From Swiss-Prot:
Converts 2-succinylbenzoate (OSB) to 2-succinylbenzoyl-CoA (OSB-CoA). Gene3D superfamilies: 3.30.300.30, N-terminal domain of ligase-like. It comes from Bacillus velezensis (strain DSM 23117 / BGSC 10A6 / LMG 26770 / FZB42). Coiled coil: none annotated. GO terms for molecular function: ATP binding; medium-chain fatty acid-CoA ligase activity; o-succinylbenzoate-CoA ligase activity. One of its GO terms (biological process) is fatty acid metabolic process. Pfam families: AMP-binding (PF00501), AMP-binding_C (PF13193). This is 2-succinylbenzoate--CoA ligase. Belongs to the ATP-dependent AMP-binding enzyme family. MenE subfamily.
Length: 487
């Protein structure tokens, strides 16, 4: 049985050295140049930071070439990369640094080194890049069962857990994605999502495994992304709903080169899908988690309207099962989504309790609720922890949010349960509005689309909704926004 592979970047630089690997701010870099830059960073990390095989290096960088070098440099040294969210607070990062037992924190301007020096050795990436590199003998192979990256769950509930993503997980994810989406020599994958998020990071590994350029953006800007798609002939883009909405608002026709918009972060509402179809945007809806190293389920565009709201079918070599009380559910029966496949993490770092709760007979319990139809298409209903039980009836916030998003005045919607003396809990809606609207109008609008018990008892206007790094709505924080009730 295969247990190791040649280091992906080393082999890619040998196979296609002059092929474009990375495009950033209109500057191009070949795979030969990417390997050279990554090897130099590895040499500096070894020489000045004493990073070595078996260590963990935490990376706190924005989307930039040095972030790409840093990840590959860790692998060239045989070290694990701990990806830190740039949006977290100091206390949240300190917890992850301590929990991961990182030896080094690699950071950039904008973060205060002094805040972390009591917990871990620190290095500024720009200062490090200015030092003489020297030379190293890189680790020529990767062991598939070894942890490549440690990425913390977004913490929609409870404290974050370190997800151990192996080289085998990342490789299987890349291969399964290629079998699903196809790969051509023309492909260029645009990433404007953060590289500390699995949807962004996974594209770096696809790049070296496929021999495909990544067009990297520091952050998402509608104008910049549309310009980049045109000038670099981008064929694939990873996106979340807010990004897709922004692109649709600015163009009447999908850019000609674009063949795939891989959409994550939750089911797309009907009005958005209808606009995508009208403008011929090739949206592939997907379902995935940090624990599955990106998408594990994908819906092709030809099914997007016939299977409205579905996340699709599992990628090749992956499986889905819906369970209730440990037993498989029949088609259309609601239960917990469980998954199995070579891209599923090997476990949470030093969290035996969480691993025992999450795995059962090889199946990973996602904590999400859903069902399979009679053709095996997955429909994701909601997080189990977000379910609202009102007078004995189950209310899925995502269903209520989808109804509200169909209203022309509603740009974003979040729904959570609020304590009620009669019903136990009732839904409250938190809305980002584009124009004024009354609660009476919204109630009437919902009445045409939802059962009476699902209609929000109150509506609140907010400036923005709380989201994690994966752009997933953090419904447990919505009640903190309880002001500005619509009359």
């Amino acid at each position: 049985m295969l247990t190791e592979q040649p280091n992906w970047l080393i082999q890619r630089a040998q196979l296609t050295p002059e092929r474009i690997a990375l495009i950033f701010e209109n500057k191009q870099m070949t795979f030969r140049e990417l390997y050279h830059a990554s090897k130099q960073m590895a040499a500096r990390l070894s020489k000045y930071c004493s990073l070595k095989k078996g260590d963990r290096a935490a990376i706190l960088l924005s989307n930039r070439p040095e972030m790409v070098y840093a990840v590959h440099a860790c692998f060239l040294l045989g070290a694990e990369a701990v990806l830190l969210n740039t949006k977290l607070s100091k206390q949240e990062r300190l917890f992850q640094l301590e929990d991961s037992q990182a030896k080094l924190l690699l950071m950039e301007d904008g973060f205060c080194r002094e805040e972390y020096e009591s917990a871990v050795a620190t290095a500024d990436v720009d200062e490090l890049q200015a030092e003489e590199a020297g030379d190293i003998e890189p680790e020529a192979y990767v062991t598939l069962d070894d942890t490549a990256t440690l990425m913390y769950t977004s913490g929609t509930t409870g404290r974050p857990k370190g997800v151990q993503q192996t080289f085998g997980n990342h490789y299987s994810s890349a291969v399964s994605s290629a079998l699903n989406l196809g790969v051509t020599e023309r492909d260029r994958w645009l990433i404007a999502l953060p590289l500390f998020h699995i949807s962004g990071l996974s594209a770096l590994f696809k790049s070296v495994i496929y021999g495909m350029p990544v067009v990297l953006h520091q952050k998402f800007s509608v104008t910049d992304v549309l310009d980049s798609i045109s000038s670099h002939q981008v064929t694939i883009i990873s996106a979340v709903q807010t990004m897709l909405s922004g692109l649709l608002a600015e163009t009447e026709q999908c850019p000609e080169s674009l063949r795939c918009i891989l959409l994550g972060g939750g089911p797309a509402p009907l009005p958005l899908l209808e606009e995508c179809r009208r403008k011929q945007f090739p949206v592939f809806q997907s379902y995935g988690l940090t624990e599955t190293c990106s998408q594990i389920v994908t819906l092709s565009p030809e099914f997007s309207m016939d299977k409205l709201g579905s996340a699709g079918k599992p990628l090749f070599s992956c499986e889905i099962r819906i369970e209730k009380d440990g037993n498989p559910c029949a088609p259309f029966e609601h239960g917990e989504i469980t998954v199995k496949g070579p891209n599923v993490m090997k476990g949470y770092y030093h969290r035996d309790d969480a691993n025992q709760a999450a795995f059962h007979n090889g199946w990973f319990k996602t904590g999400d609720l859903g069902y399979l139809d009679d053709e095996g298409f997955l429909y994701v209903l909601d997080r189990r922890s977000d379910l609202i039980i009102s007078g004995g009836e189950n209310i899925y916030p995502a269903e209520v949010e989808a109804a509200l998003l169909a209203h022309p005045a509603v740009a974003e919607a979040g729904v959570s349960g609020s304590e009620d003396p009669k019903w136990g809990k009732v839904p409250h809606a938190f809305l980002v509005l584009t124009s004024s609207v009354s609660s009476e109008e919204l109630t009437a609008f919902c009445r045409e689309r939802l059962a009476k018990y699902k209609i929000p008892a109150a509506f609140f206007e907010v400036d923005g909704l709380p989201r994690n790094a994966s752009n997933k709505l953090m419904r447990h924080r919505l009640n903190e926004l309880r002001k500005g009730e619509l009359s």
